[in-house]
Amino acid sequence: MTDSFDDGLEGAHLDTLAIRAGIVRTAEGEHAEPIFATSSYVFANAAEAAARFGGEQDGNVYSRYTNPTVRTFEQRIAALEGGEAAVGTS
């Protein structure tokens, strides 16, 4: 279960967006965004893995593609730029 703190940020100052945009809290109740350093994820079965890698099911597959830490970064940049979405690359 996650709660997005993006609600209510419409019209927020850039400083607030830089700190608060894209934050999603997990069921763990962390105070700050966790850093997901994992490189891969566990799947319940091969069918679930195939659906995720095929883009048929939402969820993480491999950190080089996306992970919650990168998603928070992308959402924060999109909010700062006033865009719908952003893509983080290196």
Residue ranges and their predicted role:
Residues 47-90:
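Conserved N-terminal alpha-helix of the aminotransferase class I/II PLP-enzyme fold
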